[in-house]
Amino acid sequence: MKIGVYGASGRIGKLLLEELKGGYKGLALSSVFVRQKCETDFSSFSHAPLVTNDLKAFVRACECVIDFSLPKGVDNLLEALLECPKILVSGTTGLEKETLEKMQQLALKAPLLHAHNMSIGIMMLNQLAFLTSLKLKDADIEIIETHHNLKKDIPSGTALSLYETCAKARGYDEKNALITHREGLRSKESIGIAALRGGDVAGKHTIGFYLEGEYIELSHTATNRSIFAKGALEVALWLKDKAAKKYEINEMFG
């Protein structure tokens, strides 16, 4: 399958190019979208990709787009994909409502998956969080996320997805149960998220389930950002030959 990388100059984008250099499980890099000059030397790649700032040409040259860019960039990408539908794997966070609506429109034409975190470990953490939230009904739930000091969005998209998982399991009102700044006593049907920023931490997420006399913490730590690139490539492989639909990452585990 021919892969197009959108957001190639970012941290994950560069890792995607590295993983695709020799062909990842039969995947081939066919196109790279760049706004300015690309620093990557493609002479060592098994196939020379199309490197372009022409969005339509970029989309036409691939069968699947993997996106790790910025919210505005995703909006532009979706406009092109609605004209020329291709498989989409998107890991960009902080998307506006209008952009998400365009994504739903694309899902009528092509398979796509949008996730805040592409690591296999986070996929499992989500499933464990749902089960634990369901079983430990009296436990207070708190989430702590830690990232590098250059991360802009707070809380992280992954922390918000974990919150949504826990809130759904409990039947909480998702719009009102989230607490990111607490004063006074803790309300019963609430889930707090605390965000820490420092150094070069790739990502750590901990969900605490606090009972009287004991507590359980479920934690995931990313020690290498390559897991996000590899996870996105695995999603692309999984989406191949799937029907047009917006898929959830937990569906990969059946």
UniProtKB/Swiss-Prot annotation:
Database matches in InterPro entries: DapB_C (IPR022663), DapB_N (IPR000846), DapB_N_CS (IPR022664), DHDPR_bac (IPR023940), NAD(P)-bd_dom_sf (IPR036291)
SUPFAM superfamilies the UniProt entry points to: Glyceraldehyde-3-phosphate dehydrogenase-like, C-terminal domain (SSF55347), NAD(P)-binding Rossmann-fold domains (SSF51735)
GO biological process, one term: diaminopimelate biosynthetic process
Catalytic activity: (S)-2,3,4,5-tetrahydrodipicolinate + NAD(+) + H2O = (2S,4S)-4-hydroxy-2,3,4,5-tetrahydrodipicolinate + NADH + H(+); (S)-2,3,4,5-tetrahydrodipicolinate + NADP(+) + H2O = (2S,4S)-4-hydroxy-2,3,4,5-tetrahydrodipicolinate + NADPH + H(+)
Residues annotated for NADP(+) binding in this entry: R35
The protein's enzyme class: oxidoreductase
MF terms (GO), sorted A to Z: 4-hydroxy-tetrahydrodipicolinate reductase; NAD binding; NADP binding; oxidoreductase activity, acting on CH or CH2 groups, NAD or NADP as acceptor
Binding site for NAD(+): G7, A8, S9, G10, R11, I12, G91, T92, T93, A115, H116, N117, M118
UniProt xrefs under Pfam families: DapB_C, DapB_N
Active site residues according to the UniProt entry: H147, K151
Compartment annotation: Cytoplasm
Keyword annotations of the record: Amino-acid biosynthesis, Cytoplasm, Diaminopimelate biosynthesis, Lysine biosynthesis, NAD, NADP, Oxidoreductase
Organism domain of life: Bacteria
GO cellular component, one term: cytosol
EC number annotated for this UniProt entry: 1.17.1.8
NCBIfam families: dapB (TIGR00036)
Purpose of the protein: Catalyzes the conversion of 4-hydroxy-tetrahydrodipicolinate (HTPA) to tetrahydrodipicolinate.
Family of the protein in this entry: Belongs to the DapB family.
HAMAP family (alphabetical): DapB
Record's protein name: 4-hydroxy-tetrahydrodipicolinate reductase
Gene: dapB
